[in-house]
Every structure is written in structure tokens, then in C-alpha cells.
């Protein structure tokens, strides 16, 4: 499947070295002002070639909107958009066209479909995530109308973990580091991996909060069983390249605690803690939504590796090309976009939760 969402549905298409990648965002309400500066800024945050800590492949990533927008406002019809691939170097992959790169999707794609586009991984490449970021920008325009903000940053590179979380600093950091004090050590870890022709894993922190200080997020986003907010968040994140684990709130640490240590107590003003990460019973509880996304090391490394070819013969794989030494860095921006898409979808889903909402809509007509 190539579609994410229920009421706000994103369908993507295209391959890493094809002419274009593209998307169709269906379900966007009409009347939303299109913020082209926001769209451009989101694409630049994900863009490669900005520094030594990410892939040298720098695409222009100009988003060409083909439908669903008229006179700078959404029309309520599907928003179609394209991004042209202009700097692919397919020759870098000629030597591995009959090999399975270790820990890539080559092996599974070939066995499932009997054919694979070996150029940059084809459809399995994270190049497709540029479309998710563009779609996430449209979702952010919707969320802004109701005062929801999503943001992200890096909390861990290898074993070096942030002790403080500063999302404003992350916006200025070359690696989107949340902790200024740990940033240099995290950068050094990445540089050491590069020197050794290796890669390194990392963890991104994604947060949704109210746009206004001292205000809460909407309560009740999500549904209690088969459209749980935390389940949909995890589904979206796990559907992105390189993600191996997703935590909501305390996540894995929750299994080590007693109920008396974990429970979020309440008083008349609200919750006294947020170990649940803003989700209870599959629905938002008004607190900040906290998501940690764990990325494996980039499988594309420049060391000789043992593998097999498409005929099952053992051989050596030595990669060329341009690759991220740590996919968590740009991946954090993609996950922020995915959280925006999930929340926007849940906002639209919530319109059907009470008859009063429908009466309000139709009585106005």
C-alpha cells in the first residue's frame, strides 16, 4: 500500500532515480491559506548537501503543486504535487545491480516482486520521504488553524544522549541537536563513523503541543479501539525507512516501573506529570504528545561486506554513492511531518464523534 491516513489521505509515488516523485493529499478542507514559505522551509530542513553530517546529494526539492489550490487557498479537492529528481547518479549503483546490499530492502523486494530498481534503492529509498515532508507542511497549515504545533530534534546519537531539550536550539543546529552541551560530542561520534567508512544510529524526539503558552492540546483525538492515536502514530513512524522502534511517553521504561511510579496523578488544574506522553485510552488527553523514534545505523556503509548475488552466489559488496552517515538527523524532520499528518487526520476524524458537531456544521447552512 502507498497510502497513509483515513480522512486526510496521502498517496505517494515515484522512485529515487526516476524523473519525479509525487503525492496526492486527499481530504484537505477548503479555505486553508497555502503558506509557500512554510512549505519551502520544511523542504530545506530535510534537504541534503547542507553539511558534512548528512548526504552530499542535494536536490532542489521545489514542490510543484498541480491541483487542489486556487488563488493560494485549498479548494477541498485533492492536492497533487511533484518534486523533480535532478541530481541522481545511477552509475554509482552499476556494480551492485545483481547483488543484495546487506540490511537493505534489495533482498525482500526482489523475492516479492521478482524485479527491483537497483538505482538508489528505487521505491524503497528514503528519497520518497521528501513527499511526506511536503504533505506534512500542508498538514501543519491545517493544524495551525486550531493551534497545534509539531516540532522535533535529536536526543541521541549512538550512546550520546541529550540531557536537556531545547527545540529552538534544534532548529539552528546542523544535526538538529536538542542539547547544546551534548552537540559537539554527538557530532564527533558521526565524524568518527565517517572516518571509519561506517554509520551510526540515533533517536529523534517528536513533540506536539499547543501553539499558545499555558493552553492544552485538544482532548479526544483518536479513537478507543481500532484508530488509537498512539497506534496510528507508531504505524506512521514504523512505516518510514530505518525506524526500528517507537516510544510514546515513557515507552520502554514503563515496563520497569510500578503503577505508583508511572501513573499520571491529577488535581483540579489537570495532570501532574506526563508519563503517558499525552495519550490515554488511545486518545489525546490534552498534554503534550511525546514520541521517541529509534533509527538503525544507515545500512549503506563504505566497508567491504559479505553478501550474495541474485543467483545465490557468495560475493563481496563494496558500495559507492552518497549516503547519510546518520539517518536519524534528516529522519527527525520526516517524523515531525508524519506526526503532523496523523494529528491532522485525527482532527478530521473527530468531527464525527458527536452529533453536536454535525448539527453545528449543518445548522449553519
From Swiss-Prot:
Record keywords: Amino-acid biosynthesis, Aromatic amino acid biosynthesis, FAD, Flavoprotein, FMN, Lyase, NADP
E.C. number: 4.2.3.5
Pfam families per UniProt: Chorismate_synt
InterPro entries the UniProt entry points to: Chorismate_synth, Chorismate_synth_AroC_sf, Chorismate_synthase_CS
Listed GO MF terms: chorismate synthase activity; FMN binding
Assigned protein family: Belongs to the chorismate synthase family.
The name this protein goes by in its record: Chorismate synthase
The species this protein was found in: Helicobacter pylori (strain P12)
